[in-house]
């Protein structure tokens, strides 16, 4: 069992019981077709990239709401395939929570289990754990080519501290009108009164997605979502959804951004999820530590063909002879 210390002990925080165990899960409503949540997570059916104003109906055909009102459906393939525990924000970097210490590689692309499908394992070479918060930005051993990275939320640079967004930043509906999430693991259905919970499958078999309840409290390093699971395609993240992405639509930049990664919940009967907000300071330090600077000291090099089967590579203090083809000699072939 994991006890989080990613936030200051406010009244709200102290009343959120935090548990993060090894089994993954996601809780959704039981009165709509479950396929909605699966298709959403994989951009299938009516949830294709760029789709807007998607109507949702319950099992009796009654409308329960509209997903993505006048907003484009994001590409959710940025989450690691099948598990969804990490998100690609750079061709060689992913974001997740540092208490996810058990995974050493990720895959990206379609979630098909077709044996003819080939998926590459991108190995983690450096975990880049944040020294204070439940966040890390691991580096991968190769550049990911299957998907395009999602931009990072940059609201952290909209204030003087430069370390995190101002308090209440994600409660600004003008800037952030909509959030979505995706995750994997043991899947549950829950009735509206909360009395009936149905387990569907064990962990890591497929992804589900939808909206992450509603933002309730927002600080400089975490944001709390809570509310009614029966808000259209509401989803409540459970322990093993740790590290799964929180995507926000940034109305100022007119695009979807990675806002945070799921860190905590407050029980199978609860309704509170806390996400660690993306930490740009930690990411920039990781970039600086991983990058190598090569200095040529302003030297000048010249390479001259001598015309007799050799050439000279000349610097200010050294000359190297390099054999080349002598075009004046006829070929023996």
What function would you assign to each model-found segment?
Residues 2-24:
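Gram-negative bacterial Sec-dependent N-terminal signal peptides
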Residues 26-60, 77, 84-100, 199-333:
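C-terminal subregion of chymotrypsin/trypsin-like serine protease catalytic domains
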Residues 69-80:
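Post-signal peptide N-terminal segment of secreted/secretory-pathway proteins
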Residues 80, 87-89, 127-132, 145, ...:
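Extracellular/periplasmic catalytic domains that process cell-envelope and extracellular macromolecules
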Residues 90-91, 95-133, 143-146:
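Catalytic-histidine neighborhood of serine endopeptidases
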Residues 91-93, 103, 130-137, 174-176, ...:
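Extracellular structured ligand-interaction cores
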Residues 102-116, 168-170, 177-182, 248:
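Short conserved beta-strand and strand-loop elements enriched in small hydrophobics
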Residues 135, 139-240, 262-271:
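Chymotrypsin/trypsin-fold serine protease catalytic domain
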